[in-house]
């Protein structure tokens, strides 16, 4: 009966996916992004034309703001927006003002909400990473070797309280927080080049100058990463100096610590702080609710010159899980659901489709852009020396991959969508766009993709993981008991759980003992940082639009991915910790770190990455990053995927205008990696309620 039900569900979902325009099972790597290296003009992210001239008598602002102007409590629009505002072209039509966007969100720290607000980023990814356009900055220029950049701000831009926004707000972050040894903010890696921190100055109120010791060709790409404005979802970059001075010991002698400062600087929990967002926070109930209202000084307009956003308010209620969020969508309570709906399993698609007739709910499927789907990665710097040796055996890792039934994953969990894969970076990455890249992508994708238990068994035998005591369970080469423990963040979703169970089933079928270990989120972070996990699971690789903007998956540059101790070793290179604590054991160092032995792939990956990140020539840099892929092909897999670039669900009521379809997006969507700032990258401020 269960088998019959599964195939019935597959049939229903297949029809729903077709109705939503699901991507083909095999999608070719994206075309090469347009070059974005020329100095940028002060142009809009989507619009090529300036706003239309205001018609006589038109207000071009929300009625609630116009009433305040008439009452004399708010300056007129021309005094509230910059002379050269950001112009956002609506996807379909000029919208209408009014309404409240009700959100029911599982991210109680405001992470998902931050992803809907892209307005702190000076540079914006557009067209799913195919191009970059100005955002908070109106433009930029740079010298030939990309060692010096100027970032130009929009004159007349204001914080949400009406105070001027200038280069001093960046310099406050940089000088009084980042370069302040008493504060926890540190220089982000993209402001370090040639082993030296950039020299940053502000020659005037609207110019910021960056000078690097070596070429820094990724600088603009990195400014476009994340929504910014809060950590850890990017960098703060701009902090309202006029407001935050009161909490800073340098400016207020009554303050001696940064405790109150750090509490007050985050807009997600402090509704008093001025912001540069489309909506400004007005009330906050910790872990329960956050209410925001339109920012009267927001610096963006539509192509008719109407100040954005169209929607008056954002009312966020925090809920426990995606199931609770789903119920609010089906009740018609949530007008638009991006995150967390993208985390809904595809089995829910038919449920959402059924709500079309009852509440006028629309659904679409945006590509995740993921290179692995749900995946696992063995700990390359495992604390157990026996497991460390086994996990570094390529035969063993390939055997784990051959023992995964990807056909089953694709059919049952992803309903025939996506692309089976051994695990790569995003198929939408620029590295896979030319003929060399397409060939590399295919080799990497197909490295150990077949479901072949005979091959898996033979490779496990070759790796020495044999049944030493005749109990039917494979042991370590020493004869000691072997248990593979897949460590998962306890706050996971049904898709992660379902795929991980199929992985467990496959591994057990070749004689491996497997446990799935759900761990508290905070503890999972500690285990990752200290290299205490066994095999990390319930996660996915999807970063883009190129390897170098977030290299952690393919190059071990931090402690938060495959080789924590080696990543931490690399991370302190060039800092005052380099070369210190060598008399201590790796786990006793702060942070815990270890130098790789000669011949370890870490050295080759670091060599290629260090060369690529300072290579100003685009073609040469592309060739270097493709060599990084070649290391993964020749010595991997280091992470093991299942089904890549699967579709994700978004929903919205038919009363909502200007929500793009996947066909209107540059690459059909790119919802997986947070560095792409979905859904801020499709500008919710131009979405509206039809009246």
Regions found by a protein language model. Name each.
Residues 4-5, 16, 20-55, 67, ...:
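Extracytoplasmic/periplasmic ligand-capture domains
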Residues 9-14:
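Hydrophobic helical h-region of N-terminal Sec-dependent signal peptides
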